[in-house]
């Protein structure tokens, strides 16, 4: 699918970002950049077919989201730390995949759980302020697709409880994601 077709699919062609949303959108762009690189890092673990398959499927959606965020934000509004988000995303994908399929699924579930909450905050803000309903719809589409990834990872992992180490890892991902969002809103 060409970029313009994708932008049309998300109804994102004529949206201008309200000033009070630029920081959030910058963090969305940074986050989608990191997400693309999570899957690129995971793909390096080429001997695990399950990881390769999940990475291939999820990567395309994250790449689509990044195309949309690139379209919506001007170059001057994008994070100045994109190289950092690429390195961190790649490292997270590579390390978690290296530790095995279940651990990779725990990672994806944790990341996507954070992303869902992040998008929902923005959707709620736009709805309450009654501004930019077109942007709200784009964010809802992205959020719904992130929830699909979260549910896929949860299902693939199985519904048994996480180990203590997996819980610690999940909490670390949540804290790291929170720091990344706050930094990328500013820089």
Please annotate each region the language model reported.
Residues 1-187:
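Non-heme di-metal
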